[in-house]
Swiss-Prot record:
Gene3D superfamilies: QueA-like. GO terms for biological process: queuosine biosynthetic process; tRNA wobble guanine modification. GO terms for cellular component: cytoplasm. This is S-adenosylmethionine:tRNA ribosyltransferase-isomerase. The lineage of its organism: Bacteria, Bacillati, Cyanobacteriota, Cyanophyceae, Synechococcales. Its EC number is 2.4.99.17. Pathway: tRNA modification; tRNA-queuosine biosynthesis. InterPro entries: QueA, QueA_dom1, QueA_dom2, QueA_sf. PANTHER family: S-ADENOSYLMETHIONINE:TRNA RIBOSYLTRANSFERASE-ISOMERASE. Monomer. GO terms for molecular function: S-adenosylmethionine:tRNA ribosyltransferase-isomerase activity. Its main location: cytoplasm. Pfam families: Queuosine_synth (PF02547).
Length: 369
């Protein structure tokens, strides 16, 4: 059972020096550092420091690696306002008939009834219209061409006019981010942020892992902006989270069952893969195919149904991702590990280093039964 501090948001705060926020990825992808968490009964003095390339040695023949194959849309649009001046939209989610929820900047100067123009080199200007304010998100409902009804149909427009939306704590602007802020297996468009643990997996590392007899399965969770936003309520006992669109296909369920049958371990790459798998098992009837919005909360006290191990990055203070990782290894332990990582000069957040939580490092009470 979690103690009272586990249900207080302020218990998930920590201080990160600004120079620990990674501004650029390492090359090659698998050369990022890897902090290996010791087994649950061991001391944190046994933390190990490796490279992500070495992670293949931590995996066993028969294991199943589950990755998130979402693709980041070029969802950042620079616009010219009808009244003059420039602005910016971040396209978030469809609202039907070509209408999309967007975050607008400057929001006060994009009001219902305003016309916006998309402009790009070698492209005809394209008109958009602000239809309404969205009170829940503080965003705007914007009319796009009526055939832009989902991520797949919108992607062509975004490819012509948009940019990959890097998180605000990354201040650099480099054309290489269009490729580097995608995983190597990103095939299903719909995210506005990358599933960042997967950014470490190079083609060479994936091939080496496969050669060890480790299977690979793909889930889809379209990462929304809310994933990286701080939680805003101090009392976490009735926490609710934004929903994100998830698909766990029948072949993934079959792969998990086959992994269990052969004595393998189910390893998630990233918190989004965890959320997808656990949501697909949340109905009480075991792991089932799933397609649709998910708002599952994973925090200390949660008993995992599917996931046994996790490769993950270092996350923002007071975020839902920090709660999820705390559910695996405990809040006190996690914050001690983060402090050790800061002292050891690990790089944090989207382009930063990684942490490996093996099945034996997971709290006994959190492990799948």
């Amino acid at each position: 059972m979690p103690d009272s501090r586990d249900l207080q948001l302020s218990s998930y705060d920590y201080v990160l020096p600004e120079d620990r926020i990674a501004q650029a990825p390492v090359e090659p992808r698998h050369d990022a550092r890897l902090l290996v968490v010791p087994p649950a009964e061991r001391s944190l003095s046994e933390l190990r420091h490796q490279r992500v390339w070495d992670w293949q040695q931590e995996l066993q023949p028969g294991d199943l690696l589950v990755v998130n194959d979402t693709r980041v849309l070029k969802a950042r649009l620079r616009v010219r306002r009808s009244g003059g001046g420039l602005g910016e939209l971040l396209v978030l989610e469809p609202r039907g008939e070509g209408r999309w929820l967007c975050l607008a900047r400057p929001a006060k100067r994009m009001r219902p009834g305003d016309q916006l123009w998309l402009e790009a080199l070698e492209q005809e200007p394209l008109s958009l219209a602000v239809l309404a304010n969205d009170a829940a998100s503080g965003g705007r409902i914007v009319q796009f061409p009526p055939d832009c009804v989902d991520a797949l149909s919108l992607e062509g427009l975004l490819e012509r006019y948009g940019e990959v939306p890097l998180p605000p704590y990354i201040t650099r602007h480099d054309s290489s981010d269009q490729e580097r802020y995608q995983t190597r297996y990103a095939t299903r468009p719909g995210a506005v942020a990358a599933p960042t643990a997967g950014l470490h997996l190079s083609d060479a590392l994936l091939a080496a892992i496969a050669e060890r007899g480790v299977a690979l399965a793909h889930v889809t969770l379209h990462v929304g902006l809310g994933t990286f936003r701080p939680v805003e309520t101090e009392d976490l006992s009735d926490l609710t989270l934004h929903s994100e669109w998830v698909e766990v296909r029948a072949e993934v369920v079959e792969a998990v069952l086959a992994c269990r049958a052969r004595g393998g371990r189910v390893i998630a790459v990233g918190t989004t893969s965890v959320r997808a798998l656990e949501a697909a098992a949340a109905g009480g009837g075991g792991l089932q195919p799933l397609k649709g919005p998910v708002d599952l909360v994973i925090q200390p006290g949660y008993r995992f149904q599917v996931v046994q191990g996790l490769l993950t990055n270092f996350h923002l203070p007071k975020s839902s991702l920090l709660l999820l990782v705390s559910a695996l290894i405990g809040r006190d332990q996690l914050l001690q590990i983060y402090n050790a990582a800061i002292e050891e000069m690990y790089r944090f957040y989207s382009y930063g280093d990684a942490m490996w939580i093996a099945p034996e490092a997971v709290l006994f009470d959190a492990r799948p039964e």
